[in-house]
Amino acid sequence: DRLRTGILIGADIIAVLIPILCVSRFQLILAAALAVITYLMMDIHIDPLQMIISAAVLFVGLLAAYIILTIARSHDVEYLNGIFEMKNSRTPIFVTQPYMYIANNYDNFDCMVRAMASGYSHSFGLKMLFPLWALTGLKFLVPSLTAFPLFTTKEELTTVTLFYDAYYDFGILGVVLLGCVLGLLAWYLTDMVKHIRNPIGYLLYAQIAVYFGLSFFTTWFSNPTTWFYLAVTGAAAVYGEWRQ
């Protein structure tokens, strides 16, 4: 029992240290969100007072880590607020950054839609298939597969929304089709979670939940990292079910 507890504590410490050592605020938030959702989905009885205290401690800890990582990334607050065109250049970055990422990402989507309307050609599936080109190395052998301009309002702000690549590929039809596929995925996961018997299954559910919840942040399902995470988690979930 002590060995098992020690291994679990060590794994938790490593999981927290990885995003900190990578100086990645998003990875830190993602790790915390996955842990919280997985824990809540496991239907473990939690005292309300204990839950409130834990949530407060987690929030304060994440906020402190976010600020520290922002400083570690050498992000000057006034410089970033200048890019965001904030009226008050001294507004705390942890207040302006999340809001401006959301607002600017939809501005980037609008910028791309206007570019398509002005005569740029759609990519007809090549953008959404970027994980295939990246994970197989084809993007290096055939550079034309990924040679598409990124339409953004500012050179420094390159994050986009979930539907960016879908519209880039097929316009409104691409957005509708992706929405239908994601809707079916949500229905399947909602049904699947009723029959899950191991924590890894809940972790897989939590990953999709985070991707849906942060749909304004990036094109999750045309990102190679997303599919790598899903493949590893899915394999672990299948192995866990097999062991049981």
Stretch-by-stretch model annotation:
Residues D1, M41, V113-M116, Y167, ...:
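Hydrophobic residues in alpha-helical segments
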Residues P19-R25, L132-T136, F216-F217:
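Membrane-interface helix-loop junctions at the exits of transmembrane helices
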Residues L62-L182:
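Small-residue-enriched transmembrane helix-hairpin modules in multi-pass membrane proteins
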